């Protein structure tokens, strides 16, 4: 049913796109649509004043269970760039990519080229999902400052490749933000390495990368 619904939504999006007026060139800035908040934050920090960056999945909405509306797909199609983290997180992205014209909107996968850890099944920690969430690969990369840097670098490099005339701005912005993430990484390393207790308990097994990078042990309940 989801597939049929998305086909209907895609057709509606085409109609909305045909009727709407794109704002891509009104202020001379790029229009970038991002999926959920970490991707939005990283992209906004890199793009700076060169782009209008839009957040698709609003705060309080479960990313896994989110389904794009016709208007959402139209927003993606009308954008210059669409940025997402990983299809194991935004499970709906593949169907969206099939429904849009990727010759007109650049798609950036922030985890491109990264080696991901095996995923896990979660059956009890999301009451709104009957079957829980199952990830072939763990997508929660951004929760480790050390790996968040790689996401920022991928977004930076992808934007530079597409818009080389804005290279200096993207690289300068990214460097400033990476410096902050480096400082956070150092603080995590120094503080957590001194911790006597290395185990922590969590209901949502999303911290495997953080645990691996800082010598901790995640225990799921």
Language-model segments: which ranges?
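Sec-dependent signal peptide recognition
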Residues: 2-10
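Extracytoplasmic metal-acquisition and chelation regions
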Residues: 5, 15, 19-221
């Amino acid at each position: 049913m989801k597939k049929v619904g998305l086909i209907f939504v895609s057709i509606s999006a085409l109609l909305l796109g045909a009727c709407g007026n794109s704002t891509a060139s009104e202020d001379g800035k790029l229009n970038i649509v991002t999926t959920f908040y970490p991707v939005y934050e990283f992209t906004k920090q890199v793009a700076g004043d060169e782009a209008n960056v839009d957040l698709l999945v609003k705060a309080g909405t479960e990313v896994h269970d989110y389904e794009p509306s016709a208007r959402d797909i139209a927003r993606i199609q009308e954008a210059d760039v669409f940025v997402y983290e990983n299809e194991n997180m935004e499970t709906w992205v593949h169907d969206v990519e099939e429904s849009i014209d990727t010759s007109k909107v650049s798609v950036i996968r922030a985890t491109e080229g990264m080696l991901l850890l095996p995923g896990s099944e979660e059956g009890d920690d999301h009451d709104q999902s009957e079957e829980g969430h199952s990830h072939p690969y763990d997508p929660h990369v951004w929760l480790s400052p050390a790996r968040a840097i790689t996401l920022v670098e991928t977004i930076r490099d992808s934007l530079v490749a597409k818009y080389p005339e804005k290279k200096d701005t993207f690289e300068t912005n990214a460097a400033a933000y990476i410096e902050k993430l480096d400082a956070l990484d150092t603080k995590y390393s120094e503080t957590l390495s001194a911790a006597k207790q290395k185990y922590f308990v969590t209901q949502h097994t999303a911290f495997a990368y953080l645990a691996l990078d800082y010598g901790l042990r995640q225990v799921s309940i």
